[in-house]
């Protein structure tokens, strides 16, 4: 039996191992840099009309946001404006350290889908979630189904809530409450 320190590999095996090793490192680098490149750390990291996904940051009361595709199945928000003051009615916002600017956001609702929506000013962006229509909302939130959407002139039924956004372009959603919140 050969001494393990002197076992020789065929040249092709060493080249293949090197190629596989480089490929793994490339994929890892691409994945980590892609996520970092999409992190939102200031309002100007997102263009008006782009979407962001918001999640809780390490179990704390702060949130993290990343740019994402607007057509994802996850709950996303559309950046509507960067404001130094208040955002519009129904708009939510993100604040950032070292700036007074706010990134104003509109929920990116899809017709026919149900969402958990916070009902009080103490709610968080992470409380907005896609949810089963028969689901149970967290305390302080309600479940709403998006019946229809369109420009600001859309008419909603009397028993529906009309959420209207003016920026980046007129958009309105007709929502039916499915819970007692």
Which residues make up each language-model segment?
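Bacterial N-terminal signal peptides that target proteins for export
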Residues: 3-20
